[in-house]
Amino acid sequence: MKNEQMALLFSEATPYIQKYHGKTLVIKYGGNAMVNDELKLAVMNDLVTLTLLGVRVVLVHGGGPAINDMLKKVGKESRFVNGLRYTDAETMGIVQQVLAGQVNKDLVALLKGRGVGLCGMDGHMIMCRRKTDADLGFVGEIERVNTTLIDHLLADSFIPVIATVGMDKNGVPYNINADTAAAEIAIALHAEKLVSMTDIVGLLRDKNDESTLIPEVELSEIEGYKAEGVIAGGMLPKIEGMADAIRQGVHEAVIIDGRMPHSVLLEMFSDRGAGTMFYRRGNR
C-alpha cells in the first residue's frame, strides 16, 4: 500500500474511531463463520484491535457445526424448528460440552490473554424459562440478562466471550439461540452496535445469488420480507433479535460476512461498511 493510500485510509477511519471510542459493541460470531483456524485468528486479532482503539467489545458465539459434528458422532440427528435447534436432555449435555467447553475455550485462547470465557449460567448472567410456543425441549426464552460480570470485565479492558447456555430459577440449563442472546445482551448493555458475523454476505433476495444483497432494511420492511420468504429459517431469530434490539435502544445492527477477512473492521471504520444494515426510520 502506498503512503498516500495509507493516509487516506486513516483519514476515512478517524471519525469512526472517534464515534465508537468508549462505546459498547456486541458481536455475535456464528459457528458457520468459523471456517478455519487462520480466519478465526484473524477475527480475534481484529477484536483486539478494536479494544486497543477504545471500543468495549463483547463476543457472543454460536457453534452449530461443532454441535452437529458431536451429535453425529453419538448417532443423533440434528433437528430444527423455525431456525431453532430441538434440544432433548442428551442434546443439552452435548450443547454445554461443545459451546461452553470446546468452542468457548478455543476462542479465548486465540485472544491471547485479552478474553475471558463465560457461560450464560455464570453469575446468573442469562436467566430464562422453557420456550413454550413450540416443542423444542430444553430451549430457553430469556427473561433477564444480568450484566454485572460483563461490566466488570469491560471496565478492565477484557473481552467477555460468552457461550449461550442459560438457566432457569432452579438451575436447569437451557440452550439459548446465540442471535437472540446477543440481541438481549446488547439491549441490557445499552450497546451502540450489534454485529452478526455469519457465513453469508448479508440478507439476500435470492439466497443463491450474492449480487441480490439488500444493503439496508428499515424495520417496517421486515414483515414484507418474511411474507416473501426472503427472511426464513435461521434468518428469523437473527433478524427478529436485531429488530428488537433497535426498538429497545441499540443504535445500529448489521449482518456481515464473517468469512471475509477484516469484515468487522471494514464495517466499523469505513464509509461503505459491509453487509446489511437494519435501522429504524428517524434513528439514523
Stretches found by the model and what they are:
Residues 1-259, 266, 272, 279-284:
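Nucleotide/pyrophosphate-binding catalytic subdomain
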